[in-house]
Every structure is written in structure tokens, then in C-alpha cells.
Amino acid sequence: MSKVLVLKTTAQADEVSNSVALTNRFLEEYKKFNPDDEIIIVDLNKDEVGTSILTSETFPTFYQQEVTKKYINLLKSVDKLVIACPMYNFSTPVTLKSFIDHVSVANETFSYKYSKKGDAIGLITNLKAQILGVQGAPLGWYPWGQHTQYVEGAMRFLGIEFNKTVLLAGVKVAPLLELTPAQRVETIIDEVIQAAKTF
């Protein structure tokens, strides 16, 4: 049995959120292959880890906060991580960026201490992660808007390995624009099922 941490990051209400629809459908399929796994869902909008941002005022104590320790320990205690990752203005939601800031702590989640080449060594080596990405534009319209690649890179820096990202792209243009979030997810259901099977 595995423990699975699921991060909800959307600023939208659940009923209109494409990333919530994608995450729910993924978990539905995942449970078919892993019925005994424990699923822990955290809504970053409702937790300090997603709303306490790094600024000049918070920087002096940012990495000493209890919430930082709590989520580093949580990452070390689970086996799998699911990241719901919608695109907002070509980037991730601020809640997800804040989470990444909180858990990226030298000598806790990464280290340069034993590096032979000067690059970082990730210390969160117990985890496999799955990104469930959503974006309004079709893939390739805005090459600089690679929000899922940023998240994957930041998490790999910490030592986390990844299943192939699932991306629901083009939700703000026809033909997907005319569909409900759940219907949009069904257009990539084969990818969702494959990801659930291999995760």
C-alpha cells in the first residue's frame, strides 16, 4: 500500500476547474489499479503552505516556519505525489510556487555538500510524482509558457522522479471551449488511464 499526496492548486471553484476535473478523473482511474492506497488531498488555497509567500518581509524567517517543516516531513513520509497544475498567465498558480518555495530548503531537500560536479543533490528520493497540467492554449502556441516543465524541473532538483506528464491543452479555444471540464478530460482519457496505470 502506498501513501499518495495530492496537491490542489487552482484558484477556481471546483465545479468549473479543469484541473480539478482532471485530478478527479485521474484518481478515479488510479484507484482501480491501486484500491488500497491512502490518498491525502491538500488544497493549497486553504493552507499556509500555499498562501504564505516569499517576500522581503517574510524571507528572514520563511524557511524556519513550522509549515515548512510540516510539508518537508510530509514529502518524506509519502510514496507518491500528484500535482494539479493549471496555467495562469504562462506560469503556475502562486499557491504551487509558494509550496515549492517552502519545501526547497538547503540540507533538508537538496544539498551541494557531497556533489562532485558542483550541482545539487536532491534529498527527496522516496517519491514518484505525477503532474496533471492544464492550459488554455493548444500545445505549442506559446513556447515560453512551459509551466509543467518548470514544476518538473523544480521537483527533480529535490530528487523526485516523474511519471509522464498529462497535459490537457486548449481548454479556452474551440472545440474544447464548448465542453464542460469533465467532457474536456474525456478527450484525453487514454493518456489519463495510461498515467494512472504506470504511476
Swiss-Prot record:
Return the protein name. Answer: FMN-dependent NADH:quinone oxidoreductase
**CC cofactor:** FMN
Catalysed reactions, as listed in the record? 2 a quinone + NADH + H(+) = 2 a 1,4-benzosemiquinone + NAD(+); N,N-dimethyl-1,4-phenylenediamine + anthranilate + 2 NAD(+) = 2-(4-dimethylaminophenyl)diazenylbenzoate + 2 NADH + 2 H(+)
Give the originating organism: Mycoplasma capricolum subsp. capricolum (strain California kid / ATCC 27343 / NCTC 10154)
This enzyme's EC code(s): 1.6.5.-, 1.7.1.17
Q: Which gene encodes it?
A: azoR
This chain's function reads:
Quinone reductase that provides resistance to thiol-specific stress caused by electrophilic quinones.
Q: Which GO terms describe its molecular function?
A: electron transfer activity; FMN binding; oxidoreductase activity, acting on NAD(P)H as acceptor; oxidoreductase activity, acting on NAD(P)H, quinone or similar compound as acceptor
**InterPro entries per the UniProt record, alphabetical:** Flavodoxin_fold, Flavoprotein-like_sf, FMN-dep_NADH:Q_OxRdtase_AzoR1, NADH:quinone_OxRdtase_FMN_depd
Annotated family: Belongs to the azoreductase type 1 family.
- Record text on subunit structure and interactions: Homodimer.
Q: Does the keyword NAD apply?
A: yes
